Regions:
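N-terminal, polar/charged subdomain of small-to-medium soluble alpha/beta proteins
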Residues: 1-89, 104-145
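A charged helix-plus-loop insertion that forms the helical arch/lid used to bind
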Residues: 87-97
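Extracellular glycan-recognition regions
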Residues: 101
Protein backbone atom coordinates (compact mmCIF):
# COMPACT_ATOMS: atom_id res chain seq x y z
CA UNK A 1 0.00 0.00 0.00
CA UNK A 2 1.27 3.43 -0.98
CA UNK A 3 0.34 6.85 0.36
CA UNK A 4 1.47 10.22 -0.90
CA UNK A 5 0.75 12.49 2.06
CA UNK A 6 0.68 16.27 2.15
CA UNK A 7 0.41 18.54 5.16
CA UNK A 8 -2.44 20.92 4.37
CA UNK A 9 -4.06 24.04 5.78
CA UNK A 10 -7.27 22.76 4.16
CA UNK A 11 -8.31 20.37 1.39
CA UNK A 12 -11.44 19.11 -0.34
CA UNK A 13 -12.43 16.59 -2.96
CA UNK A 14 -15.37 16.91 -5.34
CA UNK A 15 -17.14 14.33 -7.50
CA UNK A 16 -19.61 15.60 -10.12
CA UNK A 17 -19.44 19.11 -8.63
CA UNK A 18 -20.43 17.70 -5.21
CA UNK A 19 -18.07 17.86 -2.23
CA UNK A 20 -17.51 14.33 -0.91
CA UNK A 21 -14.96 15.33 1.70
CA UNK A 22 -13.29 18.40 3.18
CA UNK A 23 -10.89 19.04 6.05
CA UNK A 24 -9.19 21.97 7.69
CA UNK A 25 -5.63 21.59 9.05
CA UNK A 26 -4.43 18.03 8.61
CA UNK A 27 -3.26 15.48 6.06
CA UNK A 28 -4.37 14.82 2.51
CA UNK A 29 -3.43 11.22 1.68
CA UNK A 30 -3.55 9.88 -1.87
CA UNK A 31 -3.80 6.08 -1.51
CA UNK A 32 -2.62 3.44 -3.99
CA UNK A 33 -3.30 -0.25 -3.46
CA UNK A 34 -0.98 -2.93 -4.82
CA UNK A 35 -1.58 -6.66 -5.44
CA UNK A 36 -1.12 -8.59 -2.22
CA UNK A 37 -2.11 -5.69 0.03
CA UNK A 38 -4.23 -6.80 2.95
CA UNK A 39 -4.74 -6.37 6.66
CA UNK A 40 -1.04 -6.09 7.65
CA UNK A 41 -0.37 -3.37 5.06
CA UNK A 42 -3.57 -1.50 6.01
CA UNK A 43 -2.74 -1.64 9.70
CA UNK A 44 0.78 -0.33 9.12
CA UNK A 45 -0.42 2.39 6.74
CA UNK A 46 -2.98 3.61 9.26
CA UNK A 47 -0.27 3.75 11.93
CA UNK A 48 1.87 5.83 9.57
CA UNK A 49 -0.97 8.16 8.55
CA UNK A 50 -1.94 8.91 12.14
CA UNK A 51 1.50 8.82 13.73
CA UNK A 52 3.96 10.25 11.18
CA UNK A 53 5.39 13.42 12.71
CA UNK A 54 5.02 16.15 10.09
CA UNK A 55 3.57 18.99 12.18
CA UNK A 56 5.74 21.51 13.98
CA UNK A 57 6.13 21.73 17.74
CA UNK A 58 6.77 24.96 19.70
CA UNK A 59 10.41 24.88 18.59
CA UNK A 60 9.54 24.65 14.89
CA UNK A 61 10.63 21.01 14.54
CA UNK A 62 8.45 18.41 12.82
CA UNK A 63 7.68 16.61 16.04
CA UNK A 64 3.89 16.26 16.10
CA UNK A 65 1.62 13.77 14.37
CA UNK A 66 -1.90 14.09 13.00
CA UNK A 67 -3.16 12.44 16.19
CA UNK A 68 -1.17 14.91 18.32
CA UNK A 69 -2.74 17.95 16.68
CA UNK A 70 -6.22 16.39 16.33
CA UNK A 71 -6.17 17.28 12.63
CA UNK A 72 -8.34 16.09 9.79
CA UNK A 73 -7.53 13.21 7.43
CA UNK A 74 -8.70 13.28 3.81
CA UNK A 75 -8.23 9.92 2.07
CA UNK A 76 -8.33 9.93 -1.73
CA UNK A 77 -7.99 6.71 -3.76
CA UNK A 78 -5.42 7.02 -6.55
CA UNK A 79 -4.47 3.81 -8.34
CA UNK A 80 -1.91 5.64 -10.51
CA UNK A 81 0.48 5.74 -7.52
CA UNK A 82 1.10 2.03 -8.08
CA UNK A 83 2.04 2.47 -11.76
CA UNK A 84 5.24 1.04 -13.20
CA UNK A 85 7.06 3.99 -14.81
CA UNK A 86 10.44 2.37 -15.38
CA UNK A 87 10.32 2.10 -19.15
CA UNK A 88 8.89 4.01 -22.06
CA UNK A 89 6.77 7.11 -22.00
CA UNK A 90 3.53 5.52 -20.88
CA UNK A 91 2.85 4.12 -17.39
CA UNK A 92 1.84 0.50 -16.93
CA UNK A 93 -0.79 -0.29 -14.33
CA UNK A 94 -0.02 -4.01 -14.08
CA UNK A 95 1.57 -3.26 -10.70
CA UNK A 96 -1.65 -1.76 -9.31
CA UNK A 97 -4.25 -3.89 -7.55
CA UNK A 98 -7.28 -4.96 -9.60
CA UNK A 99 -10.23 -2.59 -9.05
CA UNK A 100 -12.14 -5.00 -6.80
CA UNK A 101 -9.17 -5.42 -4.44
CA UNK A 102 -8.34 -1.72 -4.60
CA UNK A 103 -11.89 -0.70 -3.70
CA UNK A 104 -12.08 -3.25 -0.89
CA UNK A 105 -8.76 -2.27 0.67
CA UNK A 106 -9.40 1.48 0.33
CA UNK A 107 -12.86 1.17 1.92
CA UNK A 108 -11.48 -0.95 4.78
CA UNK A 109 -8.71 1.61 5.39
CA UNK A 110 -11.34 4.36 5.44
CA UNK A 111 -13.56 2.45 7.91
CA UNK A 112 -10.62 1.69 10.19
CA UNK A 113 -9.45 5.31 10.09
CA UNK A 114 -12.93 6.48 11.09
CA UNK A 115 -12.81 4.29 14.19
CA UNK A 116 -9.59 6.03 15.31
CA UNK A 117 -10.08 9.67 14.23
CA UNK A 118 -13.06 11.97 14.57
CA UNK A 119 -12.39 13.89 11.35
CA UNK A 120 -11.91 11.51 8.43
CA UNK A 121 -13.24 12.37 4.98
CA UNK A 122 -12.74 10.74 1.59
CA UNK A 123 -12.96 10.76 -2.13
CA UNK A 124 -14.85 8.13 -4.10
CA UNK A 125 -13.13 5.03 -5.48
CA UNK A 126 -13.31 4.83 -9.27
CA UNK A 127 -14.76 8.32 -9.71
CA UNK A 128 -13.23 11.25 -11.55
CA UNK A 129 -12.37 13.61 -8.71
CA UNK A 130 -11.22 17.19 -8.38
CA UNK A 131 -8.91 17.69 -5.41
CA UNK A 132 -8.18 21.17 -4.10
CA UNK A 133 -5.71 21.88 -1.33
CA UNK A 134 -3.64 24.55 0.32
CA UNK A 135 -0.31 22.82 0.91
CA UNK A 136 1.33 23.86 4.18
CA UNK A 137 5.10 24.03 3.73
CA UNK A 138 5.00 22.35 1.29
CA UNK A 139 5.47 19.14 3.23
CA UNK A 140 4.98 15.98 1.15
CA UNK A 141 6.05 12.38 1.85
CA UNK A 142 5.83 9.04 0.04
CA UNK A 143 4.89 6.26 2.48
CA UNK A 144 4.83 2.56 1.69
CA UNK A 145 3.70 -0.34 3.86
Amino acid sequence: MIALIQRVAHARVDVDQRCTGAIERGVLALIGVQPGDGEPQRRRMLELLLGYRIFEDEGGRMNRSLSDIQGGLLLVPQFTLAADTRSGLRPSFSTAAPPTLGREQFNLLLQEAKTRRSTVESGEFGAHMRVALLNDGPVTFWLQS
